[in-house]
C-alpha cells in the first residue's frame, strides 16, 4: 500500500507574514494582499488583520488573530510541464521531472497564459495543496 502525503504545509507565526506571501485560510491557499498589525492596549497582545485572495478561486478572505498565533502556510512546488493536449476546459500536461500525466482544468490557468496554450508548449506549473495551476507559458 502506498501512502500519499496530501497536505504540504508548514506553520509560521502570523506576525512573520508579509504582503505577497501565502497562507491557508479555510483550507484554501491564498496570497496575502494586505496585512495590518495593531497593539490593542497596555496589557493586550498585538493583533494582525490579514487580507488574502484565493489562488484558485480568487475569493477575498480576511483573518484576524494575535501576531504570535500559528498560521498554516502552503509549500508551493514549482515545475515545468509540457502540454500534451488542450480539449475543452481541460489541459493535459506531462510533468518533465517524472513524465507523469496531469490534467488541469482551464479555470486554473492564469489569464495571460490562456491565449498561448498549444500542444508541445512548455508551461510553469505550481502545485499547491495537491492542486495544480498553470502560471505562465515559457
From Swiss-Prot:
GO terms for molecular function: ribosome binding; RNA binding; translation elongation factor activity; translation initiation factor activity. InterPro entries: IF5A-like, IF5A-like_N, NA-bd_OB-fold, Rib_uL2_dom2, Trans_elong_IF5A_hypusine_site, Transl_elong_IF5A_arc, Transl_elong_IF5A_C, Translation_prot_SH3-like_sf. GO terms for cellular component: cytoplasm. SMART domains: eIF-5a (SM01376). Gene3D superfamilies: 2.30.30.30, Nucleic acid-binding proteins. It holds the Pfam family IF5A-like_N. Keywords: Cytoplasm, Hypusine, Initiation factor, Protein biosynthesis. Transmembrane segments: none annotated. It is found in: Cytoplasm. The modification Hypusine is found at residue 42. GO terms for biological process: positive regulation of translational elongation; positive regulation of translational termination; translational elongation. It comes from the Archaea. The keyword Protein biosynthesis applies. Belongs to the eIF-5A family. Functions by promoting the formation of the first peptide bond. This is Translation initiation factor 5A. The lineage of its organism: Archaea, Thermoproteota, Thermoprotei, Thermoproteales, Thermoproteaceae.
